[in-house]
Every structure is written in C-alpha cells, then in structure tokens.
C-alpha cells in the first residue's frame, strides 16, 4: 500500500501538473470506486465545472480543494473570485495510481475514474485490485465527518503534535509491540510497513519490544529516525515494490536504499548479520537481530 512518502509524491505531481484544471467531464468506469455520495450522479454533477484549486495530503489520503467555475470557463485568472465547491478525497489503498494524458486513449482494463478538462486532457485513476476509493464532499460538510478513517487519524509525523511528550503518553503501559504502535493510523498518520521497519532499524529498536519498555532517549532517536526516513523517501519519489507509480508513470527509488525491508537473508549494511523476517500482527517484519535491541 502506498504510504506517506508515496502519497506525498503523488500529491506533488498532481499539484504541479494540474494547473488550471477545470473538470468538464467525469466518467465512472467502476461505480464501487465512488464511496460518497451514494448516488453516483451526485458525484459526477458535484465535480463537473470544478476547478481543482489545491492538493493536500492527510496521512494516506489525498484531498483536492475545489472551486466552482462557470460552465463556460476554460481558464481562471483569479481563483479567489470563485466560490468553494467542497473537496475530492482519494485513498489509493493497495494498487491505485493516477496518470495524466494529453492525448487520451481508450480506458485500460483497470481504469476506474476519468476526469477531463476543456482541452480533453485526462486525469485517469487506475486500480488493479479496486480497493481505492473516492469521495466528493460538498461545501459545508467536513470530510472528517463523512470519512471515518480520515477523522480518526493521529498527528502527522512532521507536525509539532508528534513530539516526545505525545509519544511518551502513547506508549505508557502499552504491552503492544512498538511496531504495531507505529502502524496504528490513529496514533500516527501515514506510516506503513516499509517505513515502520526502516525507522525502527535506524533507531536501533527491535520491532518486537513492548512499547512501554521504550525509554525516553530511545523515543527521541525513533522520532528523529521516522522523520529522516520519510524525508529521504519523499526525496527519492517513494518506494515501488509492486504497483506504485508517480503521475509520470515512474517508479519510486527508495526501495533501492532500504536497510531491512525486503532484504531477508541479506547482510546488514552495518554489522553483516543476516536480515530476518517474521510476522507481527499479520504483517511481515524485517529487522537485524544484532543492531536492534
């Protein structure tokens, strides 16, 4: 599943590519991709003649802020003059990704949603496993109230709220493994399997440790490691091990730089001990027994 760095990479690509993109036509190729509104035609009508004003990210969710354009508008010089038109929210789930096509072709087998502007440029959403979802939340409603997972998210790893005081309270008396804590989106938003493994390795902490046993100096190292690993991956365009692509169809390159993830049986870069793999809460976990305590 695309994690914070992959979703941030997509967000940046969308923001750079979709300048003055006014949605003129919406084509739903798979109705189950539209999670809200229930009536799919409300989704279509809500997006039509909407200017995609800004792309935000919250955890693994993409959020496009929309402005209402006149049906005759083809270019907007002053976006501030337009009324807000709610938000388009996207969760890529396991295999979702976008492509931007100036010369659209017929939709491929796994095309789920197609958005066209006045020049027939196409923003295409493709999803092999079809777990990804989209919501159009009209102005006046809060996406956090409509989308349960979005409203339950913990703080962003880069935010001021994600500090040592917060982490200390979170792990207090917790017998869960520290890795399961990091994977809990209600505790910290956006970290998944890849970056939990990599961050714990960088901090020298065993993923199997009970959270309550992590001392303050270790928490400090872990917080720094999380931020550094995420920033490094964003700089590399994220990680691709299966279906993730950026808007240009390129793979992320962070997978070439991992220390433990998907390196089972290979030598640790630091101590030459072999990287091991074992499941925690049903998730494959990669670690170095010697470097992580």
From Swiss-Prot:
It comes from the Bacteria. InterPro entries: DNA_glyclase/AP_lyase_DNA-bd, DNA_glyclase_Znf_dom_DNA_BS, Formamido-pyr_DNA_Glyclase, FPG_cat, MutM-like_N-ter, Ribosomal_uS13-like_H2TH, Znf_DNA_glyclase/AP_lyase, Znf_FPG/IleRS. PROSITE patterns: FPG_CAT, ZF_FPG_1, ZF_FPG_2. One of its GO terms (molecular function) is zinc ion binding. Keywords: DNA damage, DNA repair, DNA-binding, Glycosidase, Hydrolase, Lyase, Metal-binding, Multifunctional enzyme, Zinc, Zinc-finger. Its cofactor is Zn(2+). Binds 1 zinc ion per subunit. It catalyses: Hydrolysis of DNA containing ring-opened 7-methylguanine residues, releasing 2,6-diamino-4-hydroxy-5-(N-methyl)formamidopyrimidine; 2'-deoxyribonucleotide-(2'-deoxyribose 5'-phosphate)-2'-deoxyribonucleotide-DNA = a 3'-end 2'-deoxyribonucleotide-(2,3-dehydro-2,3-deoxyribose 5'-phosphate)-DNA + a 5'-end 5'-phospho-2'-deoxyribonucleoside-DNA + H(+). The active site is at residues 2-3, 60, 283. It holds the Pfam family zf-FPG_IleRS. DNA binds at residues 110, 129, 174. A zinc finger (FPG-type) spans 259-293. NCBIfam families: fpg, PRK01103.1, PRK13945.1. Involved in base excision repair of DNA damaged by oxidation or by mutagenic agents. Acts as a DNA glycosylase that recognizes and removes damaged bases. Has a preference for oxidized purines, such as 7,8-dihydro-8-oxoguanine (8-oxoG). Has AP (apurinic/apyrimidinic) lyase activity and introduces nicks in the DNA strand. Cleaves the DNA backbone by beta-delta elimination to generate a single-strand break at the site of the removed base with both 3'- and 5'-phosphates. This is Formamidopyrimidine-DNA glycosylase. It comes from Prochlorococcus marinus (strain MIT 9515).
